[in-house]
A protein has these predicted regions:
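Short helix/turn-capping signatures at newly exposed starts of structured segments
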Residues: 1-171, 180-186
């Protein structure tokens, strides 16, 4: 049961949920999700995302999923965040075959680099790679000793990932294989 982020293409939800391609209308997205109501017990609901004409949200095990549009009313981005209030094991979120959430950030960066992706070092709990953005929820701050500043950022994991439509077609991280080989010629 994996959510696969498909750069330049969209998102493949866990089977039997559908694959959602960037460019779909809100009605098309709702139509694709409607037959799977039993897998989405809290339903698909409207939500607010700044700068989006429409946004939809639903829950999967351990994660919240948000789909949002561009100014042309077309699906343009998917966000997935860990849901700390859900006791179920979280649905993995795959990108180029690598689970993005729940692993130490430095290990995640090494795994992405091993795939040949030009991944920068995470800075201040965030990482941007083309149209992929990862962030963490703010960590509880422990007070520093009086007069001392922390020397470095401690280890952390990412809690939220957002994938938008293709940012740069020449970027190797922006390529994904469609699930239907007939789509490869589009």
């Amino acid at each position: 049961m994996t959510i696969d982020l498909l750069p330049g293409h969209g998102v493949r939800l866990p089977a039997p949920l559908p694959e959602l391609r960037f460019g779909l209308t809100e009605a098309a997205v709702r139509g694709l999700l409607a037959p799977h109501g039993e897998l989405l017990p809290d339903g698909v609901r409207n939500t607010f995302v700044c700068g989006c004409r429409w946004a939809l949200a639903f829950q999967l095990p351990g994660v919240s999923v948000t789909l949002c549009s561009d100014d042309r009313d077309r699906f343009r981005g998917v966000g997935v965040g860990r849901n700390p209030n859900d006791d179920r094991p979280a649905c993995p979120v795959g990108y180029h075959g690598i689970d993005l959430l729940g692993w130490p950030a430095n290990e995640l960066v090494e795994a992405l680099r091993a795939e040949g992706l030009p991944v920068p070092d995470p800075a201040h709990g965030t990482l941007r790679l083309g149209s992929l953005y990862l962030s963490r929820h703010p960590a509880p701050r422990r007070p520093s000793a009086p007069g001392r500043k922390p020397r470095h950022e401690g280890p952390f994991t990412f809690d939220v990932v957002f994938l938008s439509e293709r940012a740069d077609p020449s970027d190797p991280s922006e390529r994904a294989e469609p699930s239907d080989p007939s789509e490869a010629t589009e």
